[in-house]
Regions:
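Extended alpha-helical targeting/anchoring segments
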Residues: 1-235
Length: 235
């Protein structure tokens, strides 16, 4: 891929510009550190858009995650590929177990403020760079209100906690993480505005806005999930 660059780029400004451009794209990914210091960090942010190819679970199992840029996710239900587990809880939504896309355009903002964009041609990469630098950097002001409702009733939740307490008293376990679900019906929502509100409120170092056709994933996490570098894994 051919590369072009711009210098002394502000991370938050360019993040907002990229999010402004995401609405017209079916496949878009933005991963940002929000400027948080980290000894393992290579970039302030990474982004990609356009899909040369979309990869699902079967393609990934047959070697689809070999070298080259790919953006996407591994779903929780993928665990059944590695262990024989009971499916006690119904899956929420219609998300696939895994999905990645090979981007047409890739960009990275390096730690020294250099924005580097790669495309199939230098002319195409330069066109994208100009588009990004000219996009609006304002925070969006669309609807972001969500009213969450618990899946469990109060009685079900208390019953589950009391059962776990009994297991601890019996010595079956000594600690446990218990998760409960909340859902919100989306009537009107600006996903970019919501992500910006989440990111500005948390400044979480592992934040991501991921758009895969009709699926949109927003993440503002303080924790790294996993990093693999050659034969080393950090988690």
């Amino acid at each position: 891929m051919k590369k072009v660059s711009a210098y002394n780029v502000d991370p938050i400004t360019i993040e907002n510009r990229l999010l402004e451009l995401s609405s017209s794209r079916s496949f878009f990914a933005l991963y940002t550190s929000r400027g948080y210091p980290n000894s393992h960090k290579k970039y302030e942010l990474v982004f990609g858009w356009g899909a040369k190819k979309v990869l699902f679970k079967e393609e990934l199992k047959s070697g689809g995650l070999e070298s080259g840029w790919k953006f996407g996710f591994l779903g929780y239900e993928l665990r059944h590929e590695f262990e024989i587990l009971s499916k006690g809880n119904p899956a929420q939504g219609d998300w696939p177990d895994a999905q990645f896309f090979i981007p047409e355009i890739v960009g990275v903002l390096k730690l020294d403020g250099t924005l580097e964009i790669s495309g199939s041609t230098e002319e195409g990469a330069q066109k994208v760079l100009d588009m990004v630098l000219q996009a609006s950097s304002l925070t969006k002001d669309g609807p972001t209100r969500l009213e969450f409702k618990a899946i469990e009733t109060r009685a079900q939740y208390i019953q589950a906690i009391e059962s776990l307490q009994q297991h601890i008293q019996n010595g079956d376990i000594y600690e446990v993480n218990y998760c409960t679900s909340f859902r919100a019906e989306i009537k009107e929502l600006d996903s970019v505005a919501l992500f910006q509100k989440m990111a500005n409120a948390t400044d979480a170092p592992f934040s991501a806005y991921l758009k895969l056709d009709h699926h949109i994933l927003l993440c503002t996490s303080p924790e790294r999930y996993v990093l693999k570098e050659q034969r080393s894994i950090l988690s």
